């Protein structure tokens, strides 16, 4: 599992996705505000803002919300909120490594809530650098498998800088260097292949395969972290077999 896509596509996750729609919108809006604050409101000259807006539109965030976020972030509606990116590290079931990426305007609140979620759900916080060395920052494009074959997808993106195509549950993930994301997106568009998400994230260099009981424990921990307002992304080297995933979906 490259980061978190497999956990996000279980039936368990789908069952609660409507309840988390507003929270997802809030995280996307926060990304837009930060991008506008750092690089200004002009998408033509601010690639980070263009990417944040594209992601928001793909998730059906209303245009009015997007426009207000750009204005708020660039200071057009008064003083912009000063968000900071913080990365926490931890361990989950079976010694799995976890990176917790926060975007917050209150470091103390974020730290307290993350520690509480981890400790209450069978995990342990780790010192900076303890697990981050197990991950590399990569470009990750996620798309539904549908009738697409892995070979056809690889042929479409190989010349654009794709390093690997992975099968992740019901999705494919195209892995590349972060700077190659625009070329990957263009290659997919030219090939008529629709994608769901594209972002820079953290990919593990090694994986830990979980049994059913530890997979359930990990999912509880993952859910608790994803539910926190300050948490933007959760990355892990936890993996499960197709058989274990099927059992999780049955519960």
From Swiss-Prot:
Annotated GO biological process: regulation of DNA-templated transcription
Keyword annotations from UniProtKB, A to Z: Cytoplasm, DNA-binding, Transcription, Transcription regulation
Subcellular location: Cytoplasm
Gene3D superfamilies reported in the protein's UniProt record: 1.10.10.200, 3.30.70.980
Listed GO MF terms: DNA binding
Stored InterPro entries: Integrase-like_N, TACO1_YebC-like_2nd/3rd_dom, TACO1_YebC_N, Transcrip_reg_TACO1-like, Transcrip_reg_TACO1-like_dom3, YebC-like
GO cellular component: cytosol
Pfam families: TACO1_YebC_N, Transcrip_reg
Coiled coil: none
Family, per entry: Belongs to the TACO1 family.
Name of the featured protein: Probable transcriptional regulatory protein RSal33209_2002
UniProt organism field: Renibacterium salmoninarum (strain ATCC 33209 / DSM 20767 / JCM 11484 / NBRC 15589 / NCIMB 2235)
């Amino acid at each position: 599992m490259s980061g978190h896509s497999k956990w996000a596509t279980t039936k368990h996750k789908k069952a609660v996705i409507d309840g988390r729609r507003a929270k997802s919108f809030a995280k996307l809006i926060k990304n837009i505000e930060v991008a506008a604050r750092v690089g200004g409101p002009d998408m033509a000259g601010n690639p980070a803002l263009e990417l944040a807006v594209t992601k928001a539109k793909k998730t059906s965030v209303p245009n009015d919300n997007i426009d207000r976020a750009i204005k708020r972030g660039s200071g057009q509606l008064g003083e912009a909120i000063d968000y900071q990116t913080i990365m926490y590290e931890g361990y989950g079931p079976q010694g799995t490594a976890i990176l917790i990426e926060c975007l917050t305007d209150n470091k103390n609140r974020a730290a307290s809530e993350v520690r509480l979620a981890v400790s209450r759900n069978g995990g342990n916080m780790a010192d900076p650098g303890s697990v981050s060395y197990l991950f590399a920052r990569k470009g990750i494009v996620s798309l539904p498998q549908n009738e697409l074959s892995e070979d056809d997808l690889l042929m479409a993106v190989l010349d654009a800088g794709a390093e690997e195509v992975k099968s992740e549950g019901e999705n494919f993930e195209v892995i590349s260097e972060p700077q190659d994301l625009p070329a990957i997106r263009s290659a997919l568009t030219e090939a008529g292949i629709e994608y769901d998400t594209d972002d820079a994230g953290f990919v593990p260099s090694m994986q830990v395969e979980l049994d059913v009981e530890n997979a359930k424990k990990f999912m509880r921990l993952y859910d608790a972290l994803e539910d926190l307002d300050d948490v933007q992304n959760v990355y892990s080297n936890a993996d499960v077999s197709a058989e274990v995933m099927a059992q999780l979906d049955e519960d």
